[in-house]
Amino acid sequence: MADASDPEDNMQYFLIFTLLWAASSNARDWRTPDEAQVTLEYIAHAAFRLVGSQGTSLLVDPYQSRWWIGYDFPSGLPASDAVLLSHPHPDHDAGYARGATPPWSADTRIIDGPGDYTVGAFSIRGIRGRHAEPYGEEFGRINTIWRIEVAGLRVVHIGDNEPLNAAVAAEIGDVDVIMLPVDDEEHILSFEEVERYRRRLKPLVVVPMHYRHDDLESDPDRPGDLGSVDGWFARQPDGRQLGTHTISLSRSALKELPGVWVLEHSPLVTRAE
């Protein structure tokens, strides 16, 4: 993967990132004091954990082990208070809709559709979207975009949503951090469609997801229609490889380090053999 990071040692990115938003006539009313923090953890594929400062946690779009992608979902993750599932493909719901044993406990709250939800300090809006073509016809191409507000930040995970339209953009609103599916095979979104999300929503940070991890795949031809993120990332003048799978976010300095952040996958995810 191309290294577009600053020359300083990658360990600097373990520092807490914070977000400062200039006062304006449309200042965001969900802002909270600078001391509030949230931890973002990339697991692999399109799966993330968000952990609030009080310990409440969300698991977003966990994948089913060795379904399409060739590696396992890690068994050593801490329990989450709720799991958000954007759509019923097994690489986004861990096979839950098909009766697979999920990687979360029986008492975990499952949120899998549009609506407004509260989980601890997290305010969540599920926005009705549509799965990118030509996939998902078997379940009506449903896809829920997750807009998550916590610690003065708005974090958006689009699942496998189609190209952005005006109605969805208006409901998403302002964005601080967005997770977008991007890979060199343009499996879900074309590069231009990814840029349309960036231009319209103007997130401070883009975190790419839903791409091939070569170090985890034992079969060079599997999955055949999912590329790495390397080529796209090499084109990003504001790209940074953070050298970590977990970062802490707060609101007072995030815009000092805007752009594309490529996170490592969790070390708990091991190569398929």
Language model segments and positions:
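Binuclear metal-ion centers of metallo-dependent hydrolases, dominated by the metallo-beta-lactamase
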Residues: E41, V205-E273
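Proline-aspartate-enriched helix->loop->beta-strand connector
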Residues: S80, D176-V177, V194-Y211
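Metallo-beta-lactamase
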Residues: S80-P90
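Charged helix-capping and loop-helix junction motifs
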Residues: G140-R141, S190-R196, D225
